[in-house]
């Protein structure tokens, strides 16, 4: 494991990439409504990246042993899709929820964030899922302090989610970020004491991204080799921020229009 520690200047560069991500995610949120396709949202994001002189860190991405390269600039995961949904012809309907994961490269530095958006009016249980997942993110961010360890972040989010009767997704989680989209350390969403648990130190920049299911935590991958869905077909939500570890409070580099009321999370 090789963890990078960033200078203030480098963190500011990552923040600039995060600002582009944040601005475009706000546009995607506003454009999300019944009748819109996930492909149209992807095209909007691509156009806005080009207009800002930024590039996508999603499109063409190929992790080890995964074929084909990811075809979109956003991940568009609808309802029971957890992460890595491929944008295309799917038409959003009233009552859907869509997780939009999006990143950008600005001057060689990466930003990454995700939101889950209700499409029109959604069922109370779906609304509560979004609120719990968003609040879990802020619980996790509050634990992202120098002197704590990676699994303190995982534990804070998981305990919050499970206390609300939902499940934290297995296998997937957050990551370091900087010159590459995915760097060390891995930030598991579910606490596993067998996993590496490095100390959090000032200068680390990480992406924290709880993925929460209404049902059980299990998932499966579809035949497109990308889309991950809940094993039991239940709804899933996903929120993410890029966060710098400092000598004091965690510094959120993709603070999407104050997604929550504070680090404690929204009351649910």
Question: Which positions does each model-derived feature cover?
Answer:
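Active-site neighborhoods and metal-handling regions in enzymes and metal-associated proteins
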Residues: 1-268
């Amino acid at each position: 494991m090789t963890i990078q520690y960033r200078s203030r200047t480098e963190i500011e560069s990552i923040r600039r990439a995060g600002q582009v991500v944040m601005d475009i995610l706000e546009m995607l949120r506003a454009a999300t409504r019944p009748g819109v396709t996930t492909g149209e949202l992807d095209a909007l994001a691509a156009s806005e990246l080009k207009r800002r002189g930024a590039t996508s860190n999603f499109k063409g991405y190929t992790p080890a042993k995964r074929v084909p390269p990811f075809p979109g600039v956003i991940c568009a995961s609808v309802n029971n899709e957890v992460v890595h949904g491929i944008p295309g012809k799917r038409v959003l309907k009233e009552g859907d929820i869509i997780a939009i994961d999006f990143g950008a490269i600005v001057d060689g530095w990466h930003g990454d964030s995700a939101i889950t958006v209700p499409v029109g009016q959604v069922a109370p249980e779906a609304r509560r899922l979004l609120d719990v997942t968003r609040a879990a993110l802020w619980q996790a961010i509050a634990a992202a302090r120098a002197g704590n360890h990676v699994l303190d972040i995982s534990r804070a989010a998981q305990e919050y989610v499970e206390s609300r009767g939902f499940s934290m997704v297995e296998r997937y989680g957050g990551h370091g970020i900087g010159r590459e989209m995915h760097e060390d350390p891995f930030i598991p969403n579910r606490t596993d004491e067998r996993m590496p648990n490095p100390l959090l130190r000032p200068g680390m920049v990480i992406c924290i991204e709880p993925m929460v299911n209404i049902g059980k935590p299990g998932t499966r991958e579809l035949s497109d080799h990308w889309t991950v869905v809940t094993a039991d077909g239940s709804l899933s939500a996903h929120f993410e921020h890029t966060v710098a570890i400092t000598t004091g409070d965690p510094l959120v580099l993709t603070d999407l229009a104050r997604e929550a009321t504070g680090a404690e999370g929204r009351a649910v």
